[in-house]
């Protein structure tokens, strides 16, 4: 049996590194809000508009331990043929990840990191829609684990087709 504690790994110097996930920075990379029919689109409505929301997550290494995780949220409100508003947010975070086994990196980058970014991105979208003259759009919590599993299944299906 090893003296090494569960989850600890050796760094390049042979020293033990405790598993850690730190947020070094959070930032708005892109934010847009369009209300093409304003001010007419701001009038009271008999029924709620249809709101379509798209979510995407990407991650890129910056160094051996630092990663840029980007959460993209797009929301479009439509009433019949009229576009009430269209908003897009690209919100990123720089994460330092150390002492995590390689097999756990993708789930950490595509599930846990966006889960940490989401509340901030959600608030920015809510503020943008409110400042645009509409009720704040409070996006429901997102199941990033399900998104990740779906993404992995799609990639496996693509690689199976290529084989």
Curated annotation (Swiss-Prot):
Tell me yes or no: is Transport among this UniProt entry's keywords: yes
**An annotated GO BP:** protein folding
Q: Provide the alphabetized UniProt keywords.
A: Chaperone, Cytoplasm, Protein transport, Translocation, Transport
Q: Give an example GO cellular component term for this record.
A: cytoplasm
Q: Which family does it belong to?
A: Belongs to the SecB family.
Q: How does it assemble?
A: Homotetramer, a dimer of dimers. One homotetramer interacts with 1 SecA dimer.
Name used for this protein in its record: Protein-export protein SecB
